[in-house]
C-alpha cells in the first residue's frame, strides 16, 4: 500500500465531518456506515509533490516503530490524529496513524450524526484497543 499525497493524517476529523455533513444531507443517517481506516502512512521527508511515496503501515506497527525509534508521539489537535518523526539512514520520516484516542473521537461521530454504525477498512491491521472501543459501544456483526 502506497500513498503519493503530502504527509497528513489519514482521516483528519474536519474532513470526516465534512463528508458526514454532505452524506447526511443526501442520505438518511440511519442508512450510513462510517468507514474507518486501520492503517497509517510513513513518509520520507522532505515531501516532493509527484515524487515522494509513502509506505503503508498498520497502526500497531506504527506504534511499535515509535517505541523502537524512541520517537515521541505528537497529538495534532487540528486533525485529531497522532504522528511521530524518526530518522533512518540520514532520511527523516513522518508517520501518521490512528490510535485509541483518535478512533474514539471518530467513533463518537456515529452517535452524534445518528449513523447506522461503522465499517472497518483493511481488517488484519487493527490495533487491539480498537476492539475494546467497538465491543463496549456497539454490537459487532460480520457482513
What is each model feature region?
Residues 98-100, 107-112, 123-143:
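Aromatic-rich peripheral "rim/lid" segments of glycoside hydrolase catalytic domains that contact
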Residues 1-66:
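Substrate-binding surface in catalytic domains of secreted glycosidases
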Residues 59-113:
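Hydrophobic, secondary-structure "cap" segments at the distal end of domains
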Residues 10-17, 97-104, 125:
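Soluble non-cytosolic domains of exported or imported proteins
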Residues 4-6, 90-93, 135:
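A short, structure-level motif marking secondary-structure boundaries and short turns
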Residues 38, 121-123:
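Structural motif
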Residues 34, 110, 118:
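Conserved, mostly hydrophobic/aromatic
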Amino acid at each position: 500500500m502506497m500513498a503519493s499525497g503530502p504527509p497528513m493524517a489519514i482521516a483528519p476529523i474536519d474532513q470526516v465531518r465534512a463528508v458526514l455533513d454532505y452524506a447526511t444531507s443526501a442520505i438518511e443517517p440511519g442508512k450510513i456506515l462510517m468507514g474507518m481506516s486501520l492503517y497509517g502512512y510513513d513518509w520520507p521527508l522532505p515531501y516532493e509533490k509527484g515524487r515522494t511515496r509513502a509506505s503503508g503501515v498498520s497502526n500497531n506497527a506504527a506504534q511499535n516503530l515509535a517505541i523502537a525509534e524512541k520517537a515521541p508521539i505528537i497529538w495534532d489537535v487540528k486533525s485529531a490524529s497522532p504522528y511521530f518523526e524518526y530518522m533512518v539512514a540520514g532520511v527523516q520520516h513522518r508517520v501518521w496513524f490512528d490510535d485509541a484516542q483518535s478512533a474514539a473521537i471518530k467513533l463518537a461521530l456515529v452517535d452524534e450524526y445518528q449513523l447506522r454504525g461503522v465499517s472497518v477498512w483493511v481488517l488484519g491491521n487493527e490495533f487491539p484497543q480498537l476492539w475494546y472501543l467497538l465491543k463496549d459501544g456497539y454490537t459487532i456483526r460480520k457482513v
